């Protein structure tokens, strides 16, 4: 009995060796995560409730994805050459004006251009975030750092998703309209993201990072690794885009669930996803990165497929929550793994390339998924997504089972 007790460790103890500056970087970024969580519900559920079609919402998402794809590589190269810290902070400054526009209008003439700005900020984040955490940690501590990032990020995303659950109570107590509460919340969150950017600047203003005169993937091992990793990941991106960003719309169309309920559902999913990070580092340590990724993603795919057969809302929600937790348990492991198999000076560019080849097919398939839902075809997106997931998982194991992170 005593030996069992000595082996047990508090869950949070796995993060004790993560550098304090990395922890505060993660904590300060949670203000932006909170805002983006609400923003996602606003786009994918509230806009549909006020009469904007799933097809138009898909276009907004596609425009966001297009700007992300077009600028990710230039921004990634700039991050490697000019500093990942500066790119991350500058990217965060683009979020407040985007939120302010959404708080002021529902006119697509303005919302669609804001999709462009959203893509730019996302590209800046992708090119800098993983690379910056990897730069500030060692191989030993890195999985725990990425797990903490995933944990805090998803819980704060989830809190943003859950905000609409309080809106009926606020409306009843104040007499404010639904539109006023939704837009007012967006305005307040815009102010919070401004504060978040200021805190990040204060934290990192004296951080010294290594700049690289060149940022490109030479022909050879690095190029082959990034190409294989990214192409396989793009298959999952295409499958995910068919339905995952559109889950609130699917719940609305098939079961009549409004954003006051779909928001908390997404919140619960993100909390579970965040808590799954406790298992991520442990699985990677016990089984290795590749096996841990394959097992969690394959298990998730079973529940993805099962969603097509859900005949009532409670069952659909339960299946979705399990799928989300299992699929995203692999995310911090994949982030840490990619940063470990790529040289330090190419991390920003590698992150950008991987993000592009995931996001481009994801953006295209979101439009396809929105059109299918608009046409009343609610099952096919899940069948297609599950098939693409399974293909990618098998390919990933076949290609990377013998490739280990660099010391």
Give the residues covered by each predicted segment.
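Hydrophobic core of transmembrane alpha-helices in multi-pass small-molecule transporters
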Residues: 30, 98, 109-125, 315-329
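C-terminal membrane-cytosol helix-exit motif in multi-pass small-molecule transporters
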Residues: 190-210, 395-400
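Glycine-rich segments within core transmembrane alpha-helices of 12-TM secondary carriers
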Residues: 147-168, 357-365
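Helix-to-loop junctions at the C-terminal end of transmembrane segments
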Residues: 71-83, 168, 276-289, 373-374
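Cytoplasmic helix-loop-helix junction between adjacent transmembrane helices
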Residues: 114-153
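Helix-loop boundary and gating motifs at the non-cytosolic
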Residues: 8-70, 225-267
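Conserved MFS/SLC helix-loop-helix module at the cytosolic interface between two early adjacent transmembrane helices
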Residues: 70-106
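Structural signature of the two symmetry-related core transmembrane helices
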Residues: 86-100, 291-306, 383-386
């Amino acid at each position: 009995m005593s030996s069992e007790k000595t082996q047990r460790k508090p869950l949070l103890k796995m993060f004790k060796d993560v550098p304090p500056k990395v922890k505060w970087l993660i904590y300060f970024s949670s203000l932006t995560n909170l805002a983006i969580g609400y923003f996602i519900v606003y786009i994918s559920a509230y806009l549909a409730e006020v009469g904007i079609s799933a097809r138009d919402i898909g276009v907004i998402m596609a425009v966001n994805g297009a700007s992300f794809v077009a600028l990710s590589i230039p921004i990634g190269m700039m991050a490697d050459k000019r500093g990942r810290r500066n790119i991350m902070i500058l990217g965060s400054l683009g979020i407040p004006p985007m939120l302010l526009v959404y708080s002021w209008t529902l006119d697509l003439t303005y919302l669609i251009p804001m999709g462009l700005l959203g893509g730019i900020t996302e590209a800046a984040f992708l090119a800098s975030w993983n690379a910056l955490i990897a730069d500030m940690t060692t191989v030993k501590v890195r999985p725990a750092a990425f797990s903490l990032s995933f944990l805090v990020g998803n819980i704060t995303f989830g809190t943003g998703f859950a905000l609409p659950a309080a809106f009926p109570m606020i409306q009843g107590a104040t007499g404010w309209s639904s539109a006023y509460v939704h837009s007012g919340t967006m305005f307040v969150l815009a102010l919070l993201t401004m504060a978040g950017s200021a805190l990040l600047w204060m934290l990192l203003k004296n951080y010294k990072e290594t700049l690289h005169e060149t940022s490109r993937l030479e022909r050879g091992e690095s190029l082959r690794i990034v190409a294989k990793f990214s192409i396989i990941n793009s298959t999952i991106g295409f499958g995910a885009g068919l339905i995952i960003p559109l889950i609130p719309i699917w719940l609305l169309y098939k079961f009549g669930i409004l954003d006051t309920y779909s928001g908390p559902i997404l919140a619960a999913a993100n909390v579970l996803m965040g808590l799954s990070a406790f298992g991520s580092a442990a699985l990677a340590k016990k089984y290795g990165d590749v096996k841990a990724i394959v097992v969690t993603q394959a298990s998730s795919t079973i529940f993805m497929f099962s969603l097509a057969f859900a005949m009532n809302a409670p069952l659909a929600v339960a299946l979705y929550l399990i799928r989300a937790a299992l699929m995203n348990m692999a995310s911090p492991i994949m982030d840490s793994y990619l940063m470990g198999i790529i040289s330090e000076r190419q991390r920003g560019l590698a992150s950008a390339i991987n993000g592009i080849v995931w996001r481009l097919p994801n953006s295209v398939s979101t439009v396809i998924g929105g059109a299918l839902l608009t046409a009343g075809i609610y099952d096919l997106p899940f069948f297609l997504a599950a098939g693409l997931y399974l293909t990618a998982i098998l390919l990933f194991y076949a290609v990377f089972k013998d490739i280990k992170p660099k010391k």
